[in-house]
């Protein structure tokens, strides 16, 4: 993707995606036709992934932006000259933080788009009427905070944040104070932390080793255990209520389905047959999940041990933006437009759906229900946008 031909027409530079967050620059020689001449040569590593690329006016170098998934990106310059033995080292530039698209004129003027986004965790006391979500003041980061989860005693939070420059797992007190980074995976994606029912471990997914695998972390000791090692992409994992099983989404069959594996390790068992992800076990023996192929924006239900799949409610904003309570489902719903979401509740026994609160900010990734259903955590976008930046007389 993002093909750009060198000023002299001899090379085509392009980006090749291996998986989310892992993107590298490749160079392909061209004939005067133009037509491919030879095989593409990889010019950069794919971790951190490349976002945008442009040729310098003299055609000797490429300028690009790279960074982890949702994390901090930087601009760099790398030689396009053939290398006899090793990949050239990029030279990081003094400008271009959060750059995406890059363009360089023949006169040497460079322009790029600098994007920004600040998402934060908001807590909503339950019952919600007529309250509104309140930001956790201790979260002072200007980067992303997302996919939150309460500890079993409700006193601590686990969440993903890009405040260190790459997406990592953090823990904090319930009010957001004393945040502590507990992973150092280095990108490109590290997300969806879930406390174990006994509070001793945190389950999460990371793409550090490729397409996506599940990991267990003991935050008190820092011990990290890799649970899955499969070419497929696996994530959005949740514990069973007794802590003996782990439910997760995997595309190992060719599409996303819900699978279950022993928490202590062992072969997984496929649960859904028509698409699924982000499964949560209820107290009455069902799994509630999203991403069914017949209706991806709906929440579905299937017995824990497998059986008939039933659509429960429509309008889910994103696959992990729901929680299962004792009486029903809390979920971030899409309003008339995507920028007008609401927090809704669906009573499973009566089939009644109600809106708890209209959200005045765009939704982001993840939500969590506190023990005892005293409150909900949401990730909402405080600000987002982009600016065009001009660099004169480059390089």
Model-assigned labels for residue ranges:
Residues 24-26, 74-77, 120-122, 168-170, ...:
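A short loop-to-beta-strand structural motif that recurs across blades of beta-propeller domains
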């Amino acid at each position: 993707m993002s093909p750009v031909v060198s000023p002299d027409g001899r090379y085509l530079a392009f980006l090749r995606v291996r998986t989310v967050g892992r993107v590298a620059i490749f160079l392909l020689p061209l004939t005067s036709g133009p037509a491919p001449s030879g095989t593409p040569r990889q010019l950069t590593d794919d971790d951190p992934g490349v976002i945008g690329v442009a040729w310098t006016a003299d055609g000797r170098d490429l300028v690009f932006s790279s960074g982890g998934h949702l994390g901090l990106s930087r601009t760099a310059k790398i030689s396009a000259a053939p290398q006899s033995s090793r990949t050239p080292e990029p030279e990081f530039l003094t400008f271009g933080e959060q750059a995406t698209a890059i363009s360089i004129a023949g006169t040497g003027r460079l322009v790029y788009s600098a994007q920004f986004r600040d998402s934060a965790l908001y807590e909503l006391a339950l019952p919600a009427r007529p309250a509104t979500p309140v930001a956790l003041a201790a979260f002072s980061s200007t980067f992303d905070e997302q996919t939150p989860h309460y500890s079993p005693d409700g006193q601590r939070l686990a969440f993903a944040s890009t405040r260190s420059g790459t997406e990592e797992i953090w823990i904090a007190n319930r009010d957001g104070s004393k945040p502590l980074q507990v992973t150092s995976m280095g990108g490109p994606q590290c997300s969806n932390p879930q406390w174990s029912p006994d509070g001793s471990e945190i389950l999460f997914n990371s793409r550090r080793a490729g397409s996506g695998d599940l990991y267990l972390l003991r935050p008190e000791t820092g011990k990290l255990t890799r649970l899955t090692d499969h070419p497929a992409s696996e994530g959005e994992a949740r514990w069973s209520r007794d802590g003996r099983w782990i439910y997760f989404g995997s595309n190992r069959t060719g599409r996303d389905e819900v699978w279950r594996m022993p928490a202590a390790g062992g072969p997984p068992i496929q649960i859904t047959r028509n698409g699924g992800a982000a499964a949560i076990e209820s107290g009455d023996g069902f799994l509630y999940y999203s991403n069914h192929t017949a209706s991806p924006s709906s929440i579905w239900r299937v017995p824990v041990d497998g059986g008939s799949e039933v659509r429960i409610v429509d309008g889910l904003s994103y696959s992990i933006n729901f929680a299962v309570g004792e009486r029903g489902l809390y979920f971030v719903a899409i309003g008339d437009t995507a920028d007008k979401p609401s927090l809704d509740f669906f009573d499973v026994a009566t089939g009644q759906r109600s809106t708890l609160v209209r959200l005045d900010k765009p939704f982001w990734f993840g939500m969590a229900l506190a023990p005892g259903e005293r409150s909900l955590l949401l990730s909402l976008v405080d600000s987002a946008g982009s600016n065009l930046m001009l660099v004169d007389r480059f390089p």
